[in-house]
Amino acid sequence: MSRSVGTLTRADLAEAINRKMGFSRAESLDMVEAILEHMCGALRKGENVKISGFGSFVLRDKKERIGRNPKTGVEVPITPRRVMTFRASQLLRERIAKGG
């Protein structure tokens, strides 16, 4: 299976808004920035972010646990921390599986 690897950037999102919605490039970039900042703000406050038909950014608190240094084998404590995971919606998974 051959696939080219690319990266979708903020500028790409702004360009898509510019083309589809007719906003200026600056307005489009401001929209992208505002949306991302709103999402980051919600996550900072401990809220999960759900985008219907796309997926959810979910915060999880991980407890302290004992890990092991792979080089030395010495046990070391891993401190408690908050991690963010992304879970794609069923619709997004189906669209990706179909190639579009």
Curated annotation (Swiss-Prot):
It holds the Pfam family Bac_DNA_binding. GO terms for molecular function: DNA binding; structural constituent of chromatin. The keyword Iron-sulfur does not apply. PROSITE patterns: HISTONE_LIKE. It comes from the Bacteria. Keywords: DNA recombination, DNA-binding, Transcription, Transcription regulation, Translation regulation. One of its GO terms (cellular component) is cytosol. Heterodimer of an alpha and a beta chain. PANTHER family: DNA-BINDING PROTEIN HU, INTEGRATION HOST FACTOR SUBUNIT ALPHA. This protein is one of the two subunits of integration host factor, a specific DNA-binding protein that functions in genetic recombination as well as in transcriptional and translational control. NCBIfam families: himA, PRK00285.1. Belongs to the bacterial histone-like protein family. This is Integration host factor subunit alpha. It comes from Erythrobacter litoralis (strain HTCC2594). The gene is ihfA.
